Amino acid sequence: MHGESPIKRRESRKIWVGNVPVGGDAPIAVQSMTNTDTNDVAATVGQIQRLVDAGVDIVRVSVPDMDAAEAFGKIKQLVSVPLVADIHFDYKIALRVAELGVDCLRINPGNIGREDRVRAVVDAARDRGIPIRIGVNAGSLEKDLQKKYGEPTPAALVESALRHVEHLDRLDFQDFKVSVKASDVFMAVEAYRLLAKQIIQPLHLGITEAGGLRSGTVKSAVGLGMLLAEGIGDTIRISLAADPVEEVKVGYDILKSLHLRSRGINFIACPSCSRQNFDVVKTMNELEGRLEDLLVPLDVAVIGCVVNGPGEAKEAHVGLTGGTPNLIYIDGKPAQKLTNDNLVDELEKLIRQKAAEKVEADAALIARG
């Protein structure tokens, strides 16, 4: 039963992406991106709903052309979560999705075109209260910066970002967030560190093109974990070559591990060894699958033997320690003994009961003011 995070977050300006606050004292938002064909409205809406069910706060949708812009407008009417339109090159697409109710525009002012085109996009955003995300990526740096630095570097990423920030500053537009992404962890981390010292706008964190489910999760956890532990970051996206729902799950797991957000169960489980008194791996796999629907924050310990079991179980809302028989702890106190027969069924029942009690207790606390 872990407490508040010891992390002191960087001070930043608060903006709003739809009804979701980003920056300032707002919780760190978890974002993902659809990988469907945007013109396939039904498929895109279906995927967005799955992301919402997983707890996503903001969803980005690619809008490569005017047909996709019209489809985006239909999608926007069918979902409740804030949508970011990802736009490059054609400023008219940005103007159209602004008319259709987009919640945020992801652009690079540098590839939108002439000053008058950037001004038109900024004016449309200002008139409708739409924030902008400046997205700098190591794979698409401006040619002059590639020539100046020879290759992508943290300094090159930051110079590109500040160039775009100054562009918006000249237009007196401050409702924006910035990202400086790279696939190399050290490059991305250093770029964000440098940028965090130079602007007050919120930062959107990500390790771009991180990889598949396993490798991308590791890269993102290492890179974003370093930054978040230093208080840097206001919204995150875990870029995975996998089902976007996995991005949301990994994002919450990273935030939970740093006590920055709580959603669903935080499992503490041993890797198992020959001392285990029940099949820890099988038990964990079954519990994770069965309890995905629980949103209430709970610490659940599943430890196979008595070496570390009692200590871990006492720190959890619900803890299981392997033994003969196994022992269940509730709120740090021994509660009942269980055999291996129907172990998962009984444990699931106890966890759900504890979750219901916590919801009731939290509601009573809120009611008392």
From Swiss-Prot:
Swiss-Prot/TrEMBL cofactor(s): [4Fe-4S] cluster
Catalytically driven reaction(s): (2E)-4-hydroxy-3-methylbut-2-enyl diphosphate + oxidized [flavodoxin] + H2O + 2 H(+) = 2-C-methyl-D-erythritol 2,4-cyclic diphosphate + reduced [flavodoxin]
Broad EC category: oxidoreductase
Binding sites annotated in the UniProt record for [4Fe-4S] cluster: C270, C273, C305, E312
Pathway this chain belongs to: Isoprenoid biosynthesis; isopentenyl diphosphate biosynthesis via DXP pathway; isopentenyl diphosphate from 1-deoxy-D-xylulose 5-phosphate: step 5/6
GO biological process, one term: isopentenyl diphosphate biosynthetic process, methylerythritol 4-phosphate pathway
EC annotation from Swiss-Prot or TrEMBL: 1.17.7.3
Entry keyword set: 4Fe-4S, Iron, Iron-sulfur, Isoprene biosynthesis, Metal-binding, Oxidoreductase
Entry-linked Pfam families: GcpE (PF04551)
InterPro entries: Dihydropteroate_synth-like_sf, IspG_bac, IspG_bac-typ, NO2/SO3_Rdtase_4Fe4S_sf
GO MF annotations in UniProt: 4 iron, 4 sulfur cluster binding; 4-hydroxy-3-methylbut-2-en-1-yl diphosphate synthase activity (ferredoxin); 4-hydroxy-3-methylbut-2-enyl-diphosphate synthase activity (flavodoxin); iron ion binding
Cofactor stoichiometry and binding remark: Binds 1 [4Fe-4S] cluster.
Entry keyword annotation includes Magnesium: no
Keyword Zinc annotated: no
Similarity comment: family membership: Belongs to the IspG family.
Function: Converts 2C-methyl-D-erythritol 2,4-cyclodiphosphate (ME-2,4cPP) into 1-hydroxy-2-methyl-2-(E)-butenyl 4-diphosphate.
Protein's name in the database: 4-hydroxy-3-methylbut-2-en-1-yl diphosphate synthase (flavodoxin)
